[in-house]
Design a protein with these regions (language model features):
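Short strand-edge motifs at loop-to-beta-strand transitions and within beta-strands
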Residues: 129-135
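Terminal connector regions
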Residues: 26, 30-33, 137-165
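The feature marks short-to-medium sequence segments in extracytoplasmic or secretory-pathway proteins
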Residues: 76-125
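Structural beta-strand segments of beta-rich domains
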Residues: 63-65
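A short beta-turn/strand-edge loop motif at beta-sheet boundaries
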Residues: 74-79, 141-143
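Short amphipathic beta-strand and strand-loop transition segments with alternating hydrophobic
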Residues: 53-60, 108-111
Length: 165
């Protein structure tokens, strides 16, 4: 009789252990699936993003630069505070410019569709739109130099354009 009791307890422990193991395995697979889907969504968004710098204009003794960008991708772009703007100078130095209305800083001066200010989804950089940003530098760029501005979206797609004064 004692052996039957011990056998039943052992079988119950084996079943409990198997169920516990299976539950842990299923939870792990579920977490992996969620992570995989998130990574795939991010990769898809990145594949569908294409931004191109098309023109630059420098003024105010080299301390202000206007850059026009085109959204040639299939993604509407937002989160401008998570974008990076980096100015690399001809002398080798580089500066990260924050998204700010102060100096140094960069801000959006307009988003346009076919040359007209946007009316559909304001403050969202939609496909086929053009956006103009203004970069304000603490110290203007040196005359007769060629410098490089790099604009990078929140998902890592970037475009570069030279500018000078």
């Amino acid at each position: 009789m004692e052996n039957i009791f011990i056998t039943i307890v052992c079988i119950a422990l084996i079943i409990l252990g198997g169920v516990s193991y299976a539950t842990s395995a299923l939870n792990s697979v579920d977490k992996l699936t969620v992570s995989w889907k998130a990574a795939e969504a991010y990769a898809q968004e990145t594949r569908e993003t294409d931004v191109k710098a098309i023109s630059s204009e420098t003024y105010d003794n080299g301390s202000n630069i206007d850059i026009s960008l085109e959204n040639n991708g299939d993604q509407s772009l937002v989160n401008f505070d998570k974008w990076d703007v980096i100015v690399r100078y001809q002398d080798g130095g580089a500066t990260w410019i924050p998204y700010s209305t102060s100096t140094p800083g960069w801000s959006i001066t307009g988003i346009y569709y076919n040359g007209q200010p946007e009316v559909y989804e304001p403050n969202i950089f939609n496909p086929s739109e053009t956006m103009t940003i203004n970069i304000r530098l603490s110290d203007g760029v040196t005359e007769n130099t060629t410098n490089l501005a790099t604009i990078s979206t929140y998902n890592g797609i970037h475009s570069q354009i030279p500018f000078g004064w």
